[in-house]
A protein has these predicted regions:
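A short beta-strand motif characteristic of beta-propeller blades
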Residues: 39-43, 78-83, 118-123, 158-163, ...
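Short loop/turn segments that connect beta-strands within beta-propeller blades
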Residues: 73-77, 113-116, 153-156, 193-197, ...
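Short, solvent-exposed mixed-charge patches
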Residues: 1, 350-351
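Repeat-blade elements of multi-bladed beta-propeller folds
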Residues: 9-22, 46-70, 83-110, 122-150, ...
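General secondary-structure propensity
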Residues: 2-8, 142, 317, 321
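Short, glycine/acidic-enriched capping/hinge loops at junctions between secondary-structure elements
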Residues: 26-29, 66, 73
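Blade/loop signatures of beta-propeller domains
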Residues: 4-39
């Protein structure tokens, strides 16, 4: 493993869901990014990790493809508890209060006590759940490969509503106060009423969507397998701007201030002005980019043939870590270091 640069450890910070918070922007500009110089510890999850870890109060929750959810003490790298589900896990867990939730290939979303790992409830769909759960106002929203979006009670898992969108859903919804935004395998970006699931609008793109939307300044930002990044009016679905990259986009956008970044399968990371779509910069990172970037004060982090950090002002690579194993997971950025999991089953704390 090779890591370059230096760090000054500070206090840890929670990271409770995919891309840090329910806004799904991946924008953590309030965190001052310190570039780690070594791995403080390494934990073996027993099988590949394709989803992102989440963090709360010093416990890192990591889901492995073998179906296990691991609760790891970030101070020591030791396992506090482990829960074994009935199917593989590709979805990133989410934390809300004392609950940790995750979707599973057995078609269920599980809710566990985050302190003990005890199962509290489960909610069933009709196909695998790769979409991460979103929790807002006591309701859990998630999409399934059966083409449906589900809303269930966060307290007991009882169904509130189901909406069929017609194509498999791997995209993680964005939950606003009254609306839900999600991409679909049929190529549409849909806006649903959060209280009923009623479809308010749907905007087609030219191919399927696995990207998860971010919402900023009244715009829904999302990528499509038609090679394009889209910015849609959040109220109407009208296309404000779009930009064509060199290949399909499975990555999701990260937004910080007026800067939006997203990766493409063409091997480039792109940065745009949120409102105008003007290209600020693009940087070749040398690998197919499917994971979302994350943004902190001082760097845009992306996994592509190893973990890299780019200067948000110009896209120049300022730091990289070669961990000796392939990574598909999204990193967790905190003020005391970076946590990331690998396809080789390793979970690393970089400090």
């Amino acid at each position: 493993m090779e890591i370059t640069q230096t760090t000054t450890p500070e206090s840890p910070r929670d990271w409770p869901t995919l891309l840090g918070d329910n806004a799904r922007t991946g924008g953590q500009g309030q965190i001052k990014l310190h570039f780690p110089e070594k791995a403080a510890w390494q934990y073996r999850a027993g099988s590949a990790v394709r989803s992102a870890p989440v963090l709360r109060e010093g416990i890192l929750y990591v889901a492995s493809v073998s179906g296990a959810l691991h609760a790891i003490d970030v101070g020591t790298g030791t396992c506090k508890w482990k829960f074994q589900s009935a199917g593989q896990i590709h979805a990133t867990p989410s934390l809300s209060g004392n609950i940790v939730l995750f979707g599973c290939d057995d078609g269920k979303v599980y809710a566990l006590d985050r302190h003990s790992g005890k199962k509290l409830w489960e909610a069933a769909s009709q196909a695998e759940v790769w979409s991460s759960a979103v929790i807002r106002d006591g309701v859990v929203f998630f999409g399934s490969a059966d083409g449906k979006v589900y809303a269930v009670d966060a307290g007991n898992g009882h169904e509130k509503w189901v909406q069929n969108l017609g194509g498999r859903i791997y995209s993680t919804p964005y939950a606003a106060e009254h609306q839900l935004y999600v991409g679909c395998g049929d190529g549409k970006v849909s806006c649903l009423a959060a209280d009923s699931g009623k479809i308010l609008w749907g905007t087609p793109t030219g191919n399927g969507i696995d990207s998860s939307p971010a919402v900023a300044d009244g715009l829904v930002l999302i990528g499509s397998e038609d090679f394009c990044v889209y910015a849609l009016n959040a109220s109407t679905g009208e296309v404000r701007w779009k930009y064509e990259t060199g290949l399909g986009i499975a990555s999701s956008p990260a937004v910080s201030g007026d800067l939006a970044t997203i990766g493409s399968k063409d091997g480039f990371l792109y940065a745009f002005d949120v409102q105008t779509g003007q290209l600020r910069w693009k940087t070749e990172v040398g690998e197919v980019v499917t994971a979302p970037p994350v943004i902190a004060d001082g760097g845009v982090c992306i996994q592509a043939g190893g973990l890299r950090a780019l200067d948000p002002a110009n896209g120049k690579i300022v730091w990289r870590a070669h961990l000796g194993t392939a990574i598909q997971s999204v990193p967790v950025l905190t003020s005391d270091g970076i946590y990331i999991a690998s396809l080789g089953s390793e979970v690393y704390a970089l400090r």
